Amino acid sequence: MEFVMKQALGGATKDMGKMLGGDEEKDPDAAKKEEERQEALRQAEEERKAKYAKMEAEREVMRQGIRDKYGIKKKEEREAEAQAAMEANSEGSLTRPKKAIPPGCGDEPEEEDESILDTVIKYLPGPLQDMFKK
């Protein structure tokens, strides 16, 4: 009977102490292995960051080439120029600075009303055109 019990429990009796919170076997090289693993992780992270920085630098060079080719300014440069223009306009003013008017707004002449009327008159028959022109 003892033999059967030993065979059934076998190595479980050795592990019982560990399961109940007993002392675990400590690997003498565990600290060294953990340190090496941490170093490898740190090194991999540094390599990843360096690769990312290199790719970003290449992208920025490409973006700058496109900006130069098409005469596009960076967003920061445009904002700085707009801010400087607003500050320059408001130096002698006692009121708050006005918002900059976008280019193209208000540049049209006041001939729009007449041009619309002229356009409508063009589509009228000849005698009616003469009436409206007088």
From Swiss-Prot:
Q: Which CDD domains match?
A: Complexin_NTD
InterPro entries recorded: Synaphin
Q: Say which domain of life the source belongs to.
A: Eukaryota
State the coiled-coil residue ranges.
29-64
Biased-composition ranges, Basic and acidic residues, are 15-60
Q: In which tissues is it expressed?
A: Nervous system. Strongly expressed in brain, where it is predominant in neurons from cerebral cortex and thalamus (at protein level).
For the region Disordered, give the residue spans: 1-60, 74-114
Keyword Transferase set for record: no
Keywords tagged on the record = Cell projection, Coiled coil, Cytoplasm, Exocytosis, Neurotransmitter transport, Synapse, Transport
Q: List the disulfide bonds.
A: none
Q: What is its main location?
A: cytoplasm
A single GO molecular function term of this UniProt record: lipid binding
Q: Does the keyword Magnesium apply?
A: no
Annotated segments matching region Interaction with the SNARE complex:
48-70
GO cellular component term, pick one: SNARE complex
GO terms, biological process: insulin secretion; modulation of chemical synaptic transmission; regulation of exocytic insertion of neurotransmitter receptor to postsynaptic membrane; regulation of synaptic vesicle fusion to presynaptic active zone membrane; synaptic vesicle exocytosis
Any matching Pfam family: Synaphin
Q: Where in the cell is it found?
A: Cytoplasm, Cytosol; Presynapse; Perikaryon
Whom does it interact with, and what assembly results?
Binds to the SNARE core complex containing SNAP25, VAMP2 and STX1A.
> What does this chain do?
Positively regulates a late step in exocytosis of various cytoplasmic vesicles, such as synaptic vesicles and other secretory vesicles. Organizes the SNAREs into a cross-linked zigzag topology that, when interposed between the vesicle and plasma membranes, is incompatible with fusion, thereby preventing SNAREs from releasing neurotransmitters until an action potential arrives at the synapse. Also involved in glucose-induced secretion of insulin by pancreatic beta-cells. Essential for motor behavior.
Query: What PANTHER family does this protein map onto?
Result: COMPLEXIN, COMPLEXIN-1
The family classification in the record reads: Belongs to the complexin/synaphin family.
Name-wise, this protein is Complexin-1
